[in-house]
Amino acid sequence: MTKPLLLSLIFFIIPAALAVDVDQSKNEVKAQRYFGSISISNANVKQCVWFAMKEYNKGSEDKYLFLLDKTLHATLQITDRMEYHIDVQISRSNCRKPLNNTENCIPQKNPKLEKKLSCSFLVGALPWNGEFDLLSKECKDV
């Protein structure tokens, strides 16, 4: 039972290790696999969206939390980590910051407070280590 496990680990680790190329003269990491589409239902994409939303709400000066309406598109690039470029639509909720865990947040119904945004997040991840970094975010009113 250990041989098949060992072989599968070898076949996974070696290509992953070869996927990254560091240019020592420029001290930069080159992408070995450029952005390609990935399913929005992928577990890593969902983790990255959750992380990006948490970071967005933490950094936002809005008095209300924003909720994910839908994930529109996701792409993946492999460098020294996995980089997910994710396009989402989010909306202001009825929950004020800081969140009380007993609240059930729903999108804002008050027309004066309603707000929808289209956002692009770039999340660097080593999901197997639980490491996530929000590399960039850009949001525009819808």
Swiss-Prot record:
Disulfide bonds join 95-105, 119-139. Gene3D superfamilies: 3.10.450.10. A motif (Secondary area of contact) lies at residues 77-81. CDD domains: CY. One of its GO terms (cellular component) is cytoplasm. Belongs to the cystatin family. Performs a specialized role during sperm development and maturation. This is Cystatin-8. It comes from Rattus norvegicus (Rat).
